[in-house]
């Protein structure tokens, strides 16, 4: 039984503002999205694990919850999945259907403002991914004391 589930087939399809408006005006949003999927821009061209996940709250908090060493948008999604795996909690993936990303205005935290912040986030991902279960357990325990 998975402690975390990515509820889509790891494909993310981005809709433009016009496509989003048309979808939201349709009688059946899901049918509209599925009918027009081929016209939506595929994100990254590789499997994604971000944007949406379901998790056992108790297990997730035991695993540290959100890693606040990340700023902005980016590798925190992959870190979250890898951390769960290192700590021995299975992550499931639904293999039926993409994630549809509706257009929306972007806020300040939706991008990196400088290379140093982007680099710091990538280094945090690498740091976590290189840990074994004991190192990661100790590291997560230290997060509770950092405030």
What name fits each language-model region?
Residues 42, 47-48, 57-58, 62, ...:
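C-terminal catalytic/acceptor-binding lobe
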Residues 1-69:
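Conserved catalytic core of nucleotide-sugar-dependent glycosyltransferases
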């Amino acid at each position: 039984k998975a402690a975390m589930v990515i509820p889509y087939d790891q494909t993310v399809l981005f809709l433009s503002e016009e496509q989003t408006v048309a979808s939201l005006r349709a009688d059946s949003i899901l049918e509209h999205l599925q009918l027009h999927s081929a016209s939506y821009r595929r994100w990254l061209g590789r499997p994604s694990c971000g944007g949406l996940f379901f998790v056992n709250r108790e297990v997730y908090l035991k695993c540290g919850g959100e890693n606040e060493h990340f700023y902005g948008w980016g590798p925190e999604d992959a870190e979250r999945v890898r951390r769960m795996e290192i700590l021995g909690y299975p992550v499931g993936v639904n293999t039926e259907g993409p994630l549809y990303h509706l257009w929306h205005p972007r806020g300040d935290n939706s991008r990196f403002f400088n290379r140093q912040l982007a680099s710091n986030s990538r280094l945090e991902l690498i740091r976590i991914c290189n840990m074994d279960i004991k190192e990661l357990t100790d590291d997560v325990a230290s997060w509770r004391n950092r405030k």
